[in-house]
C-alpha cells in the first residue's frame, strides 16, 4: 500500500518507509501511535506494551512524553496476554508486529498501515515529522550457539562480562542476554547512545 502524496509505503508486517527512505520500525510505530492516543486522551492506562527487545531510545522518548510502558518477553503472544490482563489497547514488537487490541489479537500489517495513515491525516504531518522526538539508539545483536542455554547464561565468566558491560554503559545504554525460544542460541543485544562503547 503506498501513499503517493507523501511518497511513503507500508508493507507486510507493518514495515514502513518514510518519504526520505528511512525504515520505520515497530518501535517508531509504537511511539507515533502511543503519542497520538495519549494526545487524544485514549491511551488506556497510559501504557504502551513492548517487549524487552524494544529500543532504549523508545523508553527515553516515552519518559519525555509522560507515556508509561510495559515490557514483556519476546513474542506477540506475550504482548497480547499483557494487554488483555491489563486493559491496554496498543502494543507490539520492534519487528513490526503491532497489536491494536480493539480490532485484533495479533499484528496485522494492513491495520497498522491504516492506523499510521489515520495519524498522518489527523496531524497533517509526514512520517518523518511524526517520528520527531524519538532517537533510536544503535543496537547490536549477536547470537552465540551453545549446547546448554541455561548453563551458558549462568556461567560466572559470562555473568562477570555482562556486568562489566552494564556498568560501563550506566544509564546511557543496556545489555540484554536471553535464550532463543526456537534455537540452541543465546542472544546478546547491546545498545548505547553511540556505536562505540
Segments the model singles out, each with a brief description of its role:
Residues 13-29:
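Short Gly/Thr/Asp-enriched flexible loops that form oxyanion-binding sites at enzyme active sites
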Residues 2, 22-25, 104:
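Residue-level "hotspot" positions that anchor or transmit function at local structural transition points
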Residues 1-7, 11:
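Single conserved hydrophobic/aromatic residue that forms the stacking wall/gate
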Residues 17, 40-197:
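Phosphate-binding and adjacent anionic-ligand microenvironments
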Amino acid at each position: 500500500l503506498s501513499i503517493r502524496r507523501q511518497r511513503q509505503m507500508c508493507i507486510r508486517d507493518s514495515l514502513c518507509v518514510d518519504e526520505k527512505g528511512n525504515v520505520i520500525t515497530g518501535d517508531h510505530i509504537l511511539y507515533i501511535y502511543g503519542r497520538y492516543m495519549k494526545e487524544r486522551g485514549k491511551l488506556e492506562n497510559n501504557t504502551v506494551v513492548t517487549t524487552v527487545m524494544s529500543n532504549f531510545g523508545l523508553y527515553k522518548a516515552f519518559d519525555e512524553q509522560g507515556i508509561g510502558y510495559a515490557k514483556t518477553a519476546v513474542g506477540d503472544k506475550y504482548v497480547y496476554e499483557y494487554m488483555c490482563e491489563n486493559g491496554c489497547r496498543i502494543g507490539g514488537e520492534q519487528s513490526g508486529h503491532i497489536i491494536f487490541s480493539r480490532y485484533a489479537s495479533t499484528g496485522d500489517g494492513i491495520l497498522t498501515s491504516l492506523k499510521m495513515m489515520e495519524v498522518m491525516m489527523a496531524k497533517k504531518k509526514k512520517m518523518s515529522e511524526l517520528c520527531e522526538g524519538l532517537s533510536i539508539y544503535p543496537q547490536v545483536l549477536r547470537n552465540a550457539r551453545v549446547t546448554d542455554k541455561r548453563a551458558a547464561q549462568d556461567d560466572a565468566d559470562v555473568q562477570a562480562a555482562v556486568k562489566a558491560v552494564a556498568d560501563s554503559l550506566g544509564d546511557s545504554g543496556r545489555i540484554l542476554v536471553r535464550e532463543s525460544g526456537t534455537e540452541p542460541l543465546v542472544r546478546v543485544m547491546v545498545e548505547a547512545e553511540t556505536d562505540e562503547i
